[in-house]
Amino acid sequence: MTTEEPQRPDLARELIARATESAAHRAKRVRNQLDAVQLGQGRHTDHANTNVLRRILAEHDWPGHHLVDSEAARAAWSIALHSDDDPAFLRAAATLLGRAVQADDAPVQHWAHLHDRALTTSRRNQEYGTQLLLRADRIELCPLRAPESVDKRRATVSLPPIAVALETVRRRYMPNGTAYEVPSVVLAEAA
C-alpha cells in the first residue's frame, strides 16, 4: 500500500461518504431498527451507490488505493458488496477488483469477499466462506464448495481459518447468544 496522495480525492470523498451512510443504515437493519419505508430507502441508496460505482468503474477501472486511497478503496469494496440486485455488476466488479489485486492496488481479502458475494448472489457455492446468514438464533455459512478444503483456500487469500472467522462473527453479532431478534441478514464484511 502507499501513503502518497490519491489521484482523485474527490472520488475518495464521495465513496467514503456513500459507504459511511450505507453502513449506518445497515447497522440499524441488523439491529432491526428500521420500518418498511426505511428498508426501502436503504435499497434505493444501495442502487444509487451501485450506479455511482458503475460510473467510476467505467471511467477508471477499480478505484484502488492509488486512485482514491486505502479508505476509499475499502468504501468502494463495501458498496460493491451491497450491489446484490445486480449479479452481473457484482461479477464485473469482482473481475476488476481481481485485476487491481494483481497490480498491488487492492487487498486480496477484498477480492475474496466480493468473489464469494458474486457467487452466492448468482446462487452458486462460495469459495472462501466469507458469506454468512445471520439468523435470530445462529449464524450460518452460505453454501460452500468443497468445505473440507476451505481453510487452504482461505490461506491463499490471507484470511484466517473458517472456525476463527465464525467465532469472531458470533462474538460481534451474537454477544448474548441471540442476534438482536432479527430476520435473516446476509453478512459479508465480517467473515
Regions inferred by a protein language model and the residue ranges of each:
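Short intrinsically disordered terminal tails
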Residues: 1, 189-191
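Mature-region segments of soluble proteins
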Residues: 74-186
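N-terminal helix-rich structural modules
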Residues: 1-123
